[in-house]
């Protein structure tokens, strides 16, 4: 191959490589632009949430939960939707679900989150203790709770709220967080209100 022909092929190769790089950069920049738009959209939603207190967030959910469960005969579906709504609303919720009293133990019900324990005995763990004491329990650090049942190693703090039918506990709402001390009296009040709303389903 003569020098002229070699140079011509070299220029064509360089031009092709340049065009390919330009095409790749266009994809990258276009993708980043779309990603930035998505980030901006998420940020706006997060800012709206940040403006609200926990009490306001729970208050906003109450009418939505009422609408979801009103005259609903599909109990499992209704409880699934309640857990989905709660997990979507609060970013510090790692796991949220129901444990239902059956055969003298708490049986796993509808939930959102990672794989969970199937059965919890009365008086055992945070859920079993809440059932036994008939009280809401807030645990800032689950590792410091005697007899804690570690369904997930990612769980750091927890709140459990009993659901009553008359004077009897028929289920509990269990919520876990990956962070320490995520729950307070505002969560307790909000979840206790929700427990009253869903009680007729049991």
Placement of each model-derived feature along the sequence:
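Intrinsically disordered, low-complexity terminal regulatory regions
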Residues: 43-110, 198, 202
């Amino acid at each position: 191959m003569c020098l002229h022909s070699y140079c011509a092929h070299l220029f064509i190769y360089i031009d092709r490589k340049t065009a390919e790089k330009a095409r790749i950069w266009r994809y990258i920049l276009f993708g980043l632009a779309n990603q930035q738009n998505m980030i901006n959209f998420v940020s706006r939603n997060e800012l709206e949430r940040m403006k609200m207190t926990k009490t306001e967030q729970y208050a906003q959910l109450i009418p939505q939960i009422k609408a979801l469960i009103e005259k609903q005969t599909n109990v499992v579906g209704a409880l699934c939707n309640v857990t989905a709504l709660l997990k979507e609303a609060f970013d510090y919720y790692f796991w949220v679900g129901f444990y239902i009293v059956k055969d003298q133990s708490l049986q796993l019900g509808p939930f959102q989150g990672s794989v969970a324990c199937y059965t919890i005995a009365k008086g055992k763990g945070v859920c079993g203790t809440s059932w036994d004491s008939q009280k809401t329990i807030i645990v800032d650090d689950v590792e410091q709770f005697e007899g804690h049942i570690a369904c997930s190693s990612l769980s750091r703090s927890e709140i459990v709220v009993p659901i009553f039918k008359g004077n009897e506990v028929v289920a509990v709402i269990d919520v876990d967080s990956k962070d320490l001390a995520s729950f307070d009296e505002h969560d307790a009040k909000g979840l206790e209100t929700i427990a009253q709303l869903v009680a007729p389903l049991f």
